């Protein structure tokens, strides 16, 4: 588990778990929200339980808090990957069909690296890294798989 997520979970428990049992009850949530000046503590607690009490037992457990924090982190990561891939597509996908063709990469290399000693090798390397179905097109899905695996895209 990510250290930041663990710290967030511990902070939340410390603030809301008044009896120290490692769980947050609805009453504990309402009490804490009142103490912090919430305008509508019942509504805020209800919202909190809708989001966090996955098994609907009326108690938010440390496991549920960890799961929620991990879900939020995963969504942020997926959004970042999506943004990286969209920006990468913008740089190469000149015909705006949502994929990068062999010709688009050749044109990009010739335009942006005119002194390249082996431009065809650059294009071949690009496609060998990204084009998993060998159709001479790189799709957003292929970009996302690559970024998810390697945390970046190849540089040209």
From Swiss-Prot:
Task: Identify the GO cellular component terms for this protein.
Answer: actin cytoskeleton; cell leading edge; cell trailing edge
**InterPro entries for the chain:** EF-hand-dom_pair (IPR011992), EF_Hand_1_Ca_BS (IPR018247), EF_hand_dom (IPR002048)
Give UniProt keywords alphabetically: Calcium, Metal-binding, Repeat
Positions binding Ca(2+) 3 in this chain are 93, 95, 97, 99, 104
> Pfam families from the xrefs?
EF-hand_5 (PF13202), EF-hand_7 (PF13499)
UniProt name for this protein: Calcium-binding protein A
Keyword check for RNA-binding, yes or no: no
**Domain of life of the organism encoding this protein:** Eukaryota
Biological process (GO) annotations held by this record are: aggregation involved in sorocarp development; cell motility
GO MF term set:
actin filament binding; calcium ion binding; calcium-dependent protein binding
The EF-hand domain covers: 4-39, 40-75, 80-115, 118-153
Q: Which residues of the sequence carry a binding annotation for Ca(2+) 4?
A: 131, 133, 135, 142
Q: Which residues bind Ca(2+) 1?
A: 17, 19, 21, 23, 28
User: Which residues make up the binding site for Ca(2+) 2?
Assistant: 53, 55, 57, 64
């Amino acid at each position: 588990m990510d250290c930041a997520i663990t710290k967030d979970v511990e902070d939340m428990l410390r603030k809301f778990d008044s009896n120290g049992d490692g769980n947050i009850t609805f009453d504990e949530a309402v009490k804490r929200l009142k103490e912090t000046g919430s305008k509508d503590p019942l509504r805020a607690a209800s919202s909190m339980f809708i989001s966090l009490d996955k098994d609907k037992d009326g108690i938010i457990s440390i496991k549920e808090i960890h799961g929620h924090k991990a879900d939020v982190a995963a969504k942020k990561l997926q959004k970042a990957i999506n943004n990286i891939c969209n920006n990468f597509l913008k740089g190469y996908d000149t015909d705006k069909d949502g994929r990068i063709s062999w010709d688009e990469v050749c044109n990009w290399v010739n335009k942006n690296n005119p002194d390249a000693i082996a431009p065809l090798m650059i294009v071949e390397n690009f496609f060998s890294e990204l084009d998993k179905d060998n159709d001479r097109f790189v799709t957003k899905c292929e970009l996302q798989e690559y970024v998810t695996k390697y945390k970046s895209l190849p540089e040209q």
